[in-house]
Regions:
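N-terminal, positively charged/glycine-rich alpha-helical extensions of SAM-dependent methyltransferases
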Residues: 1-25
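Conserved alpha-helix/loop element of class I SAM-dependent methyltransferases that forms part
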Residues: 36-54
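Class I SAM-dependent methyltransferase SAM/SAH-binding core
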Residues: 67-110
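A conserved beta-strand element that flanks and buttresses the S-adenosyl-L-methionine
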Residues: 121
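A short glycine-rich, Lys/Arg-flanked "PGG" loop and its adjoining helix->strand segment in the class I
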Residues: 135-147
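Conserved beta-strand signature within the Rossmann-like core of class I S-adenosyl-L-methionine
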Residues: 148-155
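Short, glycine-/aromatic-enriched active-site segment of Class I SAM-dependent methyltransferases
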Residues: 157-174
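Short alpha-helix
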Residues: 177-192, 198
Length: 236
């Protein structure tokens, strides 16, 4: 099985105040973490629907304190969600607040699944992973997917000045190394994923919310605050 990225406790100190810290950084957008999480998951659901795909099992890789798991369960209408994270404190909080028969959480060190999931969702994780460990991490995700399974890779877009500003205001992003869309494409292709589509979202802050209906026609312009690469695990 591919090697998991090294366990790090750095995020443990942010677990209790993670959303407060991130919301402070997001203040310039006029929105909070829930707005962006909901937008990501709904966009993923829309993309899967266009592909006539209905995943039964979903892995939330780098789930943090687990707040996206209920959104994935509801919007993707899947049967189960498993969240994994390298932060033991975050997983403890997720299990205490959100675990249910359909939603479970594990520390990354305890995660050993192979060929088990129909879809993997991963948001804003790779800019925290050292360059030398990124391909191993993608291979780990690939091995967790069933052949033909879908990987929804979300990252902050370094080509967006607003994104760079928000990250500069976020305490736990101070050591982040951003992942460009072109770099992500190369990494995913090297790991054996077939790219299905790339979309760019979150162009307008709340102050320009009246322009947000335009975002659905801007998704191929590489300037949105975040991007999603939707790809498929090849059969071999």
């Amino acid at each position: 099985m591919p090697r998991a990225p090294e366990e790090r406790s750095g995020f443990d100190r942010y677990a209790s105040g993670y959303h407060t810290c991130l919301n402070q950084a997001l203040a310039a957008t006029g929105e909070d973490t829930e707005y962006f999480a909901r937008g990501r998951v709904r966009w993923l659901a829309r993309c899967l629907s266009k592909l006539n795909l209905s995943p039964a099992s979903v892995l939330d890789f780098g789930c943090g304190t687990g707040t996206t798991a209920p959104l994935l369960l509801a919007e993707l209408r899947c049967k189960s969600v498993l969240g994994v994270d390298s932060s033991s404190e975050s997983i403890a909080q997720a299990n205490q607040a959100l675990s249910s028969p359909a939603i479970r959480f594990l520390r990354l060190r305890d995660f050993h699944s192979r060929d088990a999931f129909d879809c993997v969702y991963c948001n804003g994780v790779f800019h925290h992973i050292p360059l030398s460990e990124r391909l191993d991490t993608v291979n780990l995700i690939r091995s967790a997917l069933r052949p033909g399974g879908i990987f929804a890779f979300w990252e902050n877009n370094p080509w967006n000045p607003g994104t760079r500003y928000v990250m500069s205001q976020c305490a736990f992003d101070e050591d982040a190394i951003t992942v460009s869309p072109t770099g992500a494409h190369r990494m995913l292709r090297r790991a054996g994923f077939e790219r299905l589509r790339t979309d760019y979202l979150f162009y307008f802050p709340n102050a320009l919310a009246r322009l947000r209906p335009l975002e659905s026609v801007l998704t191929k312009i590489p300037l949105g605050g975040q991007y999603q690469i939707l790809c498929r695990r090849t059969e071999v």
